[in-house]
């Protein structure tokens, strides 16, 4: 399993998802909004299938809903976000990943509030 952390504001990273794979590249791909929303359910409110849904992705944060009931998914994983695999932290780079440290975050904000 890979833990996905999004950089939500300066100095604040939030554990947004667990992705059940052992490949950093696959975890990155599965947390991209390409033809839908990786963080939304299999079907949208209008019944249309969400082609970015994958049951290997476990969302850990609530999605935002506006006053009209419209639900907004999370952004795609991008450069400088981080992933944890086997206790090691990897930073997403323009091409690939860079090892950050061997110690997982100790002060993670689980719900994205500073």
Task: State where each predicted segment sits.
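A sequence-composition feature that detects small, non-aromatic residues
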Residues: 17, 27, 94-98, 114
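Short, conserved turn/kink motifs that form compact alpha/beta structural patches or helix kinks used as
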Residues: 22-85
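Short intrinsically disordered terminal tails
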Residues: 1, 110-114
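Tryptophan-centered short beta-strand motifs
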Residues: 13-14, 38, 97-102
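Short, compact, well-ordered microdomains
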Residues: 73-109
